[in-house]
Amino acid sequence: VESGWLTKPIVATRSVMRPDDEGLRRAAEILNASERVTILGGVGVQGAHDALVRLAGTLNAPVVHALRGKEFIEYDNPYDVGMTGLLGFASGYKAIKEADTLLMLGTDFPYQQFYPEGARIVQVDVRGRNLGRRTPIDLGLVGTVADTLEALQPLLTQKPSREHLDRSLRHYAKTRKTMDGLAVNDRDKSPIRPEYVAGLANRLASDDAVFTVDVGSPVVWAARYLEMNGRRRLVGSFNHGTMACALPHAIGAQTAFPGRQVVALAGDGGLTMLFGELITLLQNKLPVKVIVFNNSSLNFVELEMKAAGIVNFGTDLVNPDFGAVGRALGAFGRRVEHPAELEQALTDAFAHDGPAIVDVVTARQELSIPPAISVEQAKGFSLYAIRTIMAGRADELLDLVTTNVSRRLLD
């Protein structure tokens, strides 16, 4: 180009986006006057981890994260009390419900039933349209979380009491212990607990692994058992809830980061929707590791039907041996039906120089119970039980009870 403008380097600058001084003063006034502050953070906290931890220390505030904030909030955070929402922990739910002030940072958390009643709410978001969109708020601040917290921090006074924080931390420790107690080899019984699969994947994967997760039950186990450390990534269709996203997301992640380990936690329903993309792994020599949660069902749909009091129908899946399919394509492939074989199978798959498919037969009736169950949901489960028996399918109900009650009593 004769003008030469395309040859000139682009000099990037960093913009600062924060509320005005009056907005910051009002936020500080509310937070300083509160006795039980809880912080709810989302994906907007990316790049503001240290500022968030410093703020939580000043306010003695437990920090709860929404799903999309998990990878940016929970690591190296002594104030973390887990996640809230349908996939979350009882500790996160309770820390929010017991707050007299909720500080929302970079989150458009949609579930109104998980917000506190009667608490004051301050919301910070770079997108002004998100302010007050999900719940009534007392103060909305437009700005990035990083810039806003940097300007807000000097206006805050150190809270003398840790009562609310320590109570929330104790509850989280108890909840975490209970959850981790489910991610075990269940006395070598088959089918395998999905919690155990996710727990092993977490332990065996590399420190900078990129995890991609299918919508449905795999995202539940990923949210509860994958540990983020500031280097790992967690990718999924967390806004739109699109099925079959784990494999294509993994293809994209592996292409973008060829030197990193990419692990796809796929549901059997999701994987079969885009089965042909397994060939893409071979054709493009992408060493993605695919772990299939094979429960022969659209598992999360079944859970929603149970909660609505509907007897399951149209959710059965007749699956092939996914490990054999992988081998037929030229990839590493293994099927695991017994928990004692799982760790070695995952170890071998992760060490394989190329794409790998591990087909894990998991418990169909394992319930991903939310942190709080409404009266309507409890009524729905009761109706499901009655209607299932009346339909002559009492064996399904027995399997449900055995999987979720008996095993927990024995552990």
Language model features with spans:
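Conformationally flexible catalytic loops at phosphate/diphosphate-handling active centers
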Residues: 1-31, 180, 184
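Glycine-rich ThDP/TPP pyrophosphate-binding loop and its adjacent helix/strand module
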Residues: 19-26, 32-33, 319, 330-357, ...
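Glycine-rich phosphate/diphosphate-binding loops that line cofactor/substrate pockets in enzymes
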Residues: 23-37, 96-98, 200-209, 254-259, ...
